Amino acid sequence: MSKLFDSRLADVIRKPVITEKATNALDLNQYTFEVDHRAAKPQIKAAIEALFSVKVIGVNTMNPPRRTRRVGKFSGKRSQVKKAIVRLAEGDKIQLFPES
């Protein structure tokens, strides 16, 4: 792949989601990431495979509703987020936590 294509794929994945539910899903070889809200499932799959050198079996996405935040009398909305749950092939693993 070209470097330009790789840099665009790197912009698709924002950060891993570390919650109790996401950590429990690691046992099922499922990893949860926050991704760009414009990204489609094939783009997310290509980005994960290129960045982590793993084989992706399936991608599930969700667009949770935007949350309203208040600061004093001013009300606003948080930025749009999209979550992707990525299922990897048997034997593949992504190192999210450093080994100690």
UniProtKB/Swiss-Prot annotation:
Source domain of life: Bacteria
Pfam families: Ribosomal_L23 (PF00276)
Gene3D superfamilies associated with the record: 3.30.70.330
Any GO molecular function: structural constituent of ribosome
GO biological process, one term: translation
PROSITE patterns: RIBOSOMAL_L23 (PS00050)
Entry's Gene Ontology cellular component terms: ribonucleoprotein complex; ribosome
Swiss-Prot/TrEMBL keywords: Ribonucleoprotein, Ribosomal protein, RNA-binding, rRNA-binding
InterPro entries, sorted: Nucleotide-bd_a/b_plait_sf (IPR012677), Ribosomal_uL23-like (IPR013025), Ribosomal_uL23/eL15/eS24_sf (IPR012678), Ribosomal_uL23_CS (IPR001014)
Family to which this protein belongs: Belongs to the universal ribosomal protein uL23 family.
NCBIfam families: PRK05738.2-4, PRK05738.3-1, PRK05738.3-2, PRK05738.3-4
Function text: One of the early assembly proteins it binds 23S rRNA. One of the proteins that surrounds the polypeptide exit tunnel on the outside of the ribosome. Forms the main docking site for trigger factor binding to the ribosome.
Protein name: Large ribosomal subunit protein uL23
Organism annotation: Prochlorococcus marinus (strain MIT 9312)
UniProt lineage: Bacteria, Bacillati, Cyanobacteriota, Cyanophyceae, Synechococcales
